């Protein structure tokens, strides 16, 4: 496993807080089946997301409004699921 630091990524996303948000969003996308832009060598999605940012493949654009709509769609629960839990 490659060891990554904030310094490896800060050249591409210069705000540490935005870096964390972008990495978390990209890690969720990877966990949901998004195609990685770097080789995936048995690493966790968070490590792959940070490697993508460090190599300049991913930036804060990953947090656009379209992805917010995707997240809202993914989080919707059907009436059938509600009945099953009752």
Curated annotation (Swiss-Prot):
SUPFAM superfamilies in UniProt: RPB6/omega subunit-like (SSF63562)
Reactions catalysed according to its record: RNA(n) + a ribonucleoside 5'-triphosphate = RNA(n+1) + diphosphate
SMART domains with a match to the protein in the record: RNA_pol_Rpb6
Gene Ontology cellular component list: DNA-directed RNA polymerase complex
Annotated stretches, region: Disordered: 67-86
One BP term from GO: DNA-templated transcription
Keyword annotations from UniProtKB, A to Z: DNA-directed RNA polymerase, Nucleotidyltransferase, Transcription, Transferase
Keyword Phosphoprotein assigned: no
Pfam families (UniProt xref): RNA_pol_Rpb6 (PF01192)
One Gene Ontology MF term: DNA binding
UniProt superkingdom: Bacteria
Sequence ranges of Acidic residues compositional bias: 77-86
Top-level enzyme category: transferase
Protein function: Promotes RNA polymerase assembly. Latches the N- and C-terminal regions of the beta' subunit thereby facilitating its interaction with the beta and alpha subunits.
Family affiliation: Belongs to the RNA polymerase subunit omega family.
The name this protein goes by in its record: DNA-directed RNA polymerase subunit omega
